[in-house]
Amino acid sequence: MKRNINHIIAAMGVALGVLSLSSCIEETYPNNQAVPGQISSSNKSLEYLANSLPSFLTTWNTYGGSDYTQDWGYPCQMYMRDLLCEDFPMSDNGYNYWSYTEDGSSLRYAYYYPFYYYYAFIKNANNVISTTKSSVEGGNKSALPYLGQGYGYRAMLYLDLYRLYEYRKTGVASLDDAADKAGVYGLTVPIVKETTSKTELGNNPSAPFYTMYRFIMNDLNMAEEALGDYSRSNKAFMDKSVIYGLKTRLWLAMASRFEQSADDLAKQIEADKNEDGYGTLGITSANDCFAKVAEYAQKAIHADTYKPLTEAEWSDTNTGFNTANDSWMFGTLVNSKEQINTSEWYTFWGWMCSEAAWSMAQFNSYRCISKALYDKISTKDWRRQSWVNPADAGEKINAAGKDSVPAGYKTKMTGEQWAKLPQYANMKFRAGSGGITKNDLETGQIASLPLMRVEEMYFDYFEAIAHTQGVEAAAQALQDFVNTYRYTDGSYKCKAKTMDDFITALMVQRRIELWGEGLVFFDYKRLNLPIKRHYAGSNYEPSYQLNSYAGYVAPWMNYMIPEDEKDRNPAVVLGPNPSGAITAE
């Protein structure tokens, strides 16, 4: 089962060579993708078409072969984003199929798959928009919710895509100079709409940020209007609350950018005059954007009966982080064996279920929290039990001659099974239905995953009011939240007096709360926060102990558009390859 990483990367290169026969953007027809010409205008057919969107969230094997270990849908994108940060080490990297990505030495192929996956997904959303729009224009108003799904999903995908692939300064002179020479600053990715022709695909420039923002906002506005009072059947579909959440994310990205750059703000204001059909943002300052963050975060929080996870829900051994509840605003839906891949190295759950005998844990491949972050979690914070305290790790238990699970942890593991757990191993993500035995490989992977939780909206709101109401008000709000929902004794104090101190305190809470959910990557990038894996006692393998530069984006967080895309679309602008730009200290 253990594989040579060079072989894996080479295999990916072969696959990408096959894909390069046709543009990644141009030819993307996954097997479970509904093509407009195959769909009638009946509501049943339109429902089938719209169902292809949540289905594609969990689609694996989009390269058309089973040898690509980084090809398991949207959860794979989340996993990759977290391993590029600083809180996600592995206990033993012998079976780490992401080693060349995690140590930053060979990144180009790692960025190819997300580019292909996202544009394949966008193709799917465009198909939904094209067909349902025709139906609505033909008088079928019951198709509006399906149209809203298309616009909402497409907005989410472009929001991710531009944040991943836009080049931001790294502090590495050779990279930043190369980016400047290429003219890549301020550019994102090409926009492909349902109306984009094949001819246009061959000359489709990378959109500047000020166009991309307005394009995404326009999609979100269209989605909000189309969804109306739509009541969804499950949380893999979007309703207005999810659109509010996506607007919150977008406004926050803009707010951070314009706070840092008056020139970018001026360009955005000027772009409001463009007659490209995307509408206007109507802002004059970064604080206007922060006010919008606060507004839409509140709308999202109060749009439904959302409430933060309780300790019981968080740590439930059957449903913890695998079953939708009142905290989840949006997520995947996996409820049948037909939706899963039973290769443990090929799924989110195979890599993240520390308790499961069928997972990669059987090869000592545990995803852990970083020592630096774990040390910041108070003993009064019940989330602390989501990771194994070094004093409770298997080697300590064995040395002490104990044969039971230490007190305080909620698990179905026996003492004998616990004795294999390394320090800092995660207990956050539970196997489906609590299926952790060797025979539960199928049952344990019938598990959903949150893509947006209400807690994120609270954190975004706190950051926004730090700018609009002041640090003192935001610090008090954060303190109240943590004491109400996460501490057992109300002892948490947020003592921040400056904006920098508040952002530091807030990021600690984001990193703890959202660990493993693929979201803090975007916070690091928009706030120019450094990655720090090299420090005394670090539990990262030495070759992975990369430290990026303060005040800049870590080089590996600037995804690189595949070079062969330029062969099909000469108008696209490519950023420099960040591989090896920073090495372990």
Q: Where are these predicted regions, by residue range?
A:
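Alpha-helical solenoid scaffolds that mediate protein-protein interactions
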Residues: 128, 132, 161-162, 223, ...
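Sec-dependent bacterial lipoprotein signal peptides
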Residues: 1-22
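Structural register within alpha-helical repeat arrays
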Residues: 147, 154, 161, 247, ...
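Short coil/linker segments at helix-helix boundaries
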Residues: 164-215, 257-295
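Hydrophobic-face positions in mid-chain alpha helices that act as interaction patches
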Residues: 270-450, 454, 488, 513, ...
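Membrane-proximal, proline-rich intrinsically disordered regions
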Residues: 24-79, 84, 322, 350-353, ...
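Conserved, well-structured interaction surfaces
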Residues: 90-168, 202-212, 220-233, 442-449, ...
